[in-house]
């Protein structure tokens, strides 16, 4: 539309367990380069539970202390990472503030040159956090070594501030030499090419440049398929930006471009064909009148057209697991603040609902539904309900009841239930990894930079640099292996791998079991000049098959072999 903070998070099962039947009734201006506007997510109040018939005596609670407004060093995030002399630097500042919306809270950054930048604090990002972001605000060309940036929190008079001294923060920042960078290094540039219906923008030295012919073919086929599926007559070529690192879930879009992560270190569940179809649908849905429709309709349409969320699936069968469980989100809840709900459940329900609606009223009916639901300023819930009535299906409550009966006829198996539960646990574990090792990539906490604006400004670092610590690479390898086991329905093995990742997120190395083995394999590979991006455990052969990038011939792909010696040390040999 996402490296510095450390948050140890243990992720448990999402809780797809039977419960009672679900109810069906129920940024400020900154002087900096332009960025992608995120979807507007307006917070709404959650209805309170109905009061008990009998009066109850509620003990007096201790008042919650009002937090002292402050700027804290661990709540100032600086991108890209690692920070290299010559970078265009972004600041993400999350001040400590009392509860409430304050229109006049500002943060001022004083750069080493004396230049001052001021931004207003407001709710930004999918986590709806009160923050201020300064995008590509500090040009570090000509600088090097240690620098001091000063931040000041400016408060309106009505904010109680018992300790004003912590409203000013001096932040030391070290600009490292470009020699610190692993390949593809500092010389990366944007390049462009065209195929039928698409215009591809890629980064030199990237996996996308290496695989460009295959990507062009896939993009052209996806564009033709989506245009045919939506009966779109739009002829304008779509701008697709191929990123060389994972951001968000692997793809995001604006009205005139699509960004897709095309990487070797593919720990996120990003299938190129499905990402292309999903994001192309967002680009073309304006022709159906969906560009102002409730997010539930827009995301549901994209999931339906792609044929799944992360990989191909029967959306109705997967969604049929949810009714009667704690994980199910009633449609009247889901339609409001769509992006604030559990990500996989929200997208799955939305996609399955659109499959049902197309079956009931056809694609033209869905188009009409979108147009009607886009027509006024009421809440998303009211707009969707009114549009459903006009389509002849009944209001939102009635449609949900009919949809649930439709899903109920599918009778998913216990294996399908376990697989969905594990899929969600895998994605939540991935996000826990991002929060701890790659914050900018986390779609809720991080930043989804505009590649279009970056290309215009000749900025590449935010789309290339991913975590280079051995620990981060090892955890990504385990996540990718868990994903592969999950897709092959080896659920026991996938669950064990996720447990290894969760354990490693709780503790510093040395880790236990397989996590430590993979970490040692990564270190041994890096010492030989190879960066692993995939591993396969080969217990019968007593070792690991390693897929790695050759740092001396980037981004050439190699195969290595790792096995323990007589002392238990991992030895890497090859290429094979």
Q: What spans do the regions from the language model cover?
A:
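Beta/coil-rich, acidic/histidine-enriched accessory regions frequently appended to metallopeptidases
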Residues: 13-18, 37-38, 44-75, 83, ...
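A mature extracytoplasmic/lumenal domain signature
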Residues: 111, 204-206, 242-246, 264, ...
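Juxtacatalytic substrate-recognition/specificity segment
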Residues: 187-294, 309-312, 319-321, 325-328, ...
């Amino acid at each position: 539309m996402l490296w510095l903070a450390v948050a140890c998070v243990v992720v448990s099962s999402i809780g797809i367990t039977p419960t009672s039947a679900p109810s069906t009734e129920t940024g400020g201006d900154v002087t900096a380069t332009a960025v992608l506007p995120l979807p507007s997510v307006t917070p709404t109040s959650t209805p309170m539970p109905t009061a008990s018939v009998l009066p109850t005596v509620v003990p007096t609670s201790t008042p919650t202390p009002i937090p002292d407004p402050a700027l804290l060093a661990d709540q100032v995030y600086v991108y890209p990472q690692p920070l290299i002399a010559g970078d265009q630097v972004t600041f993400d500042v999350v001040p400590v503030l009392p509860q409430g919306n304050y229109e006049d809270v500002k943060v001022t950054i004083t750069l080493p040159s004396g230049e001052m930048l001021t931004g207003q604090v407001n709710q930004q990002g999918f986590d709806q956090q009160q923050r201020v972001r300064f995008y590509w605000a500090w040009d570090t060309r000509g600088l090097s070594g240690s620098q001091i940036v000063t931040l000041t929190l400016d408060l309106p008079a009505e904010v109680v501030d018992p300790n004003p001294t912590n409203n000013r923060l001096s932040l030391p920042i070290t600009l490292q030499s470009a020699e610190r960078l692993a390949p593809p290094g500092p010389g990366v540039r944007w390049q462009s090419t065209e195929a039928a219906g698409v215009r591809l923008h890629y980064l030199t030295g990237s996996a996308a440049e290496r695989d460009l012919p295959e990507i062009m073919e896939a993009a052209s086929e996806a564009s033709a398929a989506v245009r045919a599926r939506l009966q779109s007559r739009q002829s304008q070529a779509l701008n697709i930006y191929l990123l060389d690192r994972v951001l968000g879930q692997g793809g995001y879009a604006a009205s005139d471009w699509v960004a897709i992560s095309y990487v070797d270190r593919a720990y996120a569940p990003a299938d190129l064909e499905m990402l292309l179809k999903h994001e192309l649908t967002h680009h073309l849905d304006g022709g159906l009148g969906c560009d102002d429709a409730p997010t539930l309709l827009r995301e549901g349409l994209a999931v339906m057209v792609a044929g799944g969320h992360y990989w191909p699936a029967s959306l109705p069968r997967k969604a049929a697991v949810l009714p009667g469980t704690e994980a199910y989100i009633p449609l009247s809840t889901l339609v409001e603040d769509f992006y604030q709900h559990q990500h996989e459940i929200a997208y799955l329900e939305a996609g399955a609902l659109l499959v049902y609606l197309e079956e009931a009223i056809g694609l033209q009916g869905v188009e009409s539904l979108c147009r009607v639901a886009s027509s006024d300023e009421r809440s998303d819930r009211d707009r969707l309900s009114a549009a459903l009535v006009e389509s002849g299906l009944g209001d939102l409550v009635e449609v949900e009841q009919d949809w649930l009966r439709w899903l109920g006829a599918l009778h998913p198996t216990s294996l399908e239930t376990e697989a969905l539960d594990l899929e969600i646990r895998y994605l939540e574990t991935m996000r826990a990894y991002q929060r701890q090792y790659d914050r900018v990539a986390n779609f809720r906490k991080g930043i989804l930079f505009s590649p279009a604006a970056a290309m215009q400004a000749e900025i590449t670092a935010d789309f290339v640099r991913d975590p280079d610590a051995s620990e981060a690479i090892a955890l990504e390898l385990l996540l990718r292996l868990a994903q592969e086991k999950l897709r092959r329905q080896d659920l026991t093995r996938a669950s064990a791998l996720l447990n290894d990742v969760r354990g490693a997120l709780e503790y510093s190395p040395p880790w236990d079991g397989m996590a430590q083995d993979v970490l040692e394999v990564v270190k041994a590979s890096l010492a030989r000049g190879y960066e692993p991006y995939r591993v396969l455990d080969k217990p019968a052969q007593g070792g690991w098959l390693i897929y790695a990038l050759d740092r001396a011939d980037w981004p050439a792909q190699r195969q290595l072999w790792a096995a323990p010696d007589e002392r238990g040390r991992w030895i890497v040999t090859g290429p094979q």
